[in-house]
Amino acid sequence: MKRITLALLGLLLTVSAHAQVVVMDSDMFERNRNIRVKLLVQDARSEEPLPFATVYLNPQGDTTITHFTLSDQKGEVLIPDVPVGRYRLNVELIGYTPFRKDYNFRNYEEDLGTIKLEENPEIIDAASITAVGNAVEVRQDTLIYNAAAFHVGDNAMLEDLIKKMPGMEVGDDGTVKVNGEPVDKITVGGKTFFFNDPSAALKNLPAKIVDKIKVIDQENKEAAFSGIASQDSREKVMDLELKEEYKQGWFGNAKLSGGYRPGVNEEGLGDDRHALYGGNLMVSGYNEKDQLTLIANGQNASDPGGSGSSVFISVEDDLEMLDALSLLGGMKTTAMAGANLNSDRIKGMESSASVSYNFSDQISGTRTARESMLVGENPLFTNGLTSGTSRSNRVSVNFELNRKDTRKINFVFRPAFRFNSSASTSRNQSTTTDVLGEEINGTDAGKSSSSRSFQASGRISGGVRDIGKERRSLNLTVNYNFNRSLGESREDSRTWYGATVTPRNLHYDTGGSGKMVGGELSYLEPFGQYWGLAAIVNARWQQRGNDKAAFNADGSANDYYSSRSRNDYLLLNQSLQMQYRKESNQFYFGLQHAQTRNEVRSRTLGRDTETGIGEWLHDWSPYVSIRWSGKEGQSVRVSYQGSSSQPAAVQIHPVLDISNPLEISTGNIYLRPSFRHSLSLSWDFNNRKTFSNISVSLFGDMTQRGIVSASWFDADGVRYFVPVNTRKPSTSLTGYVSWRRPVGEKKRLTLGFGIQGNLSSSTHYQATSRQSGMDLLAFDYNAFMADFWGDAGGSRFYSGQSGFSESRTSQSDIYTTMQAAYRLDRFSVTLRSAIENERSRYSLDPTANTDYWRFGQYLDLLYETLHGWEFKTEVSFFQFRGYPAGFNEPYCLWDLSVSKNINAFTVSLGISDLLNQQRMQQHTVNAEYIEDRYSLVMGRYAMFSLKWSFGKMNPAKNARVQNAMYNML
């Protein structure tokens, strides 16, 4: 009996124990299970659903946002995966009084019913006036553009938004200028975004996620820490401030486009491209520690809109610039993929990393008309047609590591790597005629080339502050760059002079390498509360090597076109400055001394030549920097400094360039570094009562030993040129004035005015008569330079013994624009008119003086309906006066587009250049010639696209997709 009793007791204890376990598991499940919360957001008066309302949860007694979403088009809200517990529900929408209420969530699905928001008239009026009127603000060294004040469509990208903003310019390569000054980098929320690739942000970030664009003229991280300013320490940063709903969570879009191009451009400037396509993907995720952005795109045509206008360029005659001009225009097939990560996960550090791949395949074509000036003779006229293809692949890897706590110690490490491969082919056909139209010469030349290169560069900086005394600092920065390239090319040509025809076929193997190590050591000794004495020493050593081995068509070596050169460049820069800093105001002044040594060693035809060995150049300049910010929205900046520039590698290469047999050049191993004095003045004023803004800027440059080309023609009309230093300094002065003001009670009409003027005076060297050409069959570089240049100082050239005279060129360019923009809630219209006048005056040959006029009229219309339709049109009309025959014809560009938003999707149809009149025109003016050129363009085409917005960009977003993306972080 006792045994039975014990057995029963044990059984009961066992059952009881299991029962307790079951109860405990049930409690744990209840406490940790997730539920769904749903609600409906409506207007309290009309009971209409309110889309895009911000809805988020805070745990009771905490300000942390644990769940965040937006209401969809029907005003419905679903918040998944909410742990049971007590929360405060927050519902907010601009123009309405926020709703807040505490709840205790326990059920599997909590239906909170309808949340009705009450309108707040004061907020609505203030928001509408501020959004439209206060478009640009000035706060000390920062220009703040309010994105809401510039009406762009729902499909617009960041590039489209920036082009609407006063003073902003966006180049074809993605470079951005503000009031004529280039932006050094683009950041998002103060974080690095794809480092030195501005197009990544411009072409991939949607405009509607941007709240403000801040253009900040600031000191870099090293200078801000040390309190020491130098000529290289300031940078202009464009920071994108996102709207609140995009600062946390995931968002993105995917787009596919297809289209058709019916025509072929006239006069050989076209290809057989008819089928068009495009696609892009952008995914971005943000949380408290990480910012991750993934982008991918590819296209052979951009979306219609912004088809461009004439491009007008007036430049000095520079070898590299002329090569760059030949690449303008054309039809590109491009692709890009990349990832950018900003993270705070490394303890005590902020880190940024990006990797990107870029592909480009371009078909280009150019038609040129050139009038060449000959002193004492009638001009020569050259007409040419150039076509070509180029393909490139580039991989870029960047990393940046910054110390967070910079109160005492600063550390920055920024390495970068580049891998590049490229290939190109070109064909140039041209003829030269005299004033009577009789042909003098002609050529048909082709070239193909390929190259591969690698570059590793970086920056390491460290410093300490408050060393035994407040504000005393010591900072060291080291920069490095190592690169290597290999390539090959083939050139074939037929050149005729009357009845004489000269064929040529050459093959080249090329190689290049470069090394650069530089650094800056700075020390600040403070005295008093605001003053300090700074000493800065800057040094840079750079070595460049170039090898070029030439071979004839039969494979035998051609020593006349082969060469080897090495350039060693050393720069030492010392600066002593007095500095005054109080809050945002500063006044720096001092003296800087630049010492440069430029040594060139070359080998041609088995002979070695050395120049510049042990020769030092000394340049002195003052250093001034004044920055003042007033309390009434005023900002003043003044700076003066000097900088030294090394000659480009192609300018010192001692070998003939005969890729165009009618345009032959060689380098100059005796070139010396140039030195530029730069002065800038600017004043900005923002009236916070009228929301008006005015900006005035003035930039002046004086360049000593500037590099230009000395050119001449031979008896057959072939042009030759060699780079030389100028004896007299070149000067330029550029001024900008812009004004913008909204008018009316509701600030719906905005008026704007801008004027830009440029005055320049430069030196050129022209032959006083026709000269003998270079011996293309047996070119002896040393013998040629002895006759053309003389000794290392250019005794024969500058004295005029080799037949050249100095010519002074004066140029003026004035560009004026007036604009009126009217905006309603869903409609906007912009009218703009522009006039540009360019004049050139030449001392050596006044008959070559020029006077050109360009006129442009622009109309932009945008209308959005309540049902998600968007209609947009852009019309531009251009007129010309004073150009050669065939280049004065007016033309009109007309773009149309229509789109419809359907929940998370947007479908659109656009037609570019409806009248098929688009053209790309460049205009080059200098002392030697005037050239106009047309380049290949797309012409009329149509594109249909489908875009899907997901995450926070989709008001009816899918919770499963949102959660899956969130788990990627």
Language-model region placement:
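C-terminal beta-barrel architecture of Gram-negative outer-membrane proteins
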Residues: 831-899
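Outer-membrane beta-barrel translocator domains and adjoining extracellular loop/strand segments
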Residues: 226-228, 265-268, 296, 305-313, ...
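Short, acidic Ser/Thr/Gly-rich low-complexity loop/linker segments typical of extracellular
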Residues: 60-76
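Signature of Gram-negative outer-membrane beta-barrel scaffolds
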Residues: 532-635, 843
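A short, solvent-exposed loop/turn motif at the edges and junctions
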Residues: 59-64, 86, 90-102
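Membrane-proximal, glycine/serine-rich, low-complexity loop/turn segments characteristic
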Residues: 20-34, 44, 56, 73-76, ...
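Outer membrane beta-barrel strand-and-loop segments of large Gram-negative receptors
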Residues: 385, 516-518, 561-563, 666-668, ...
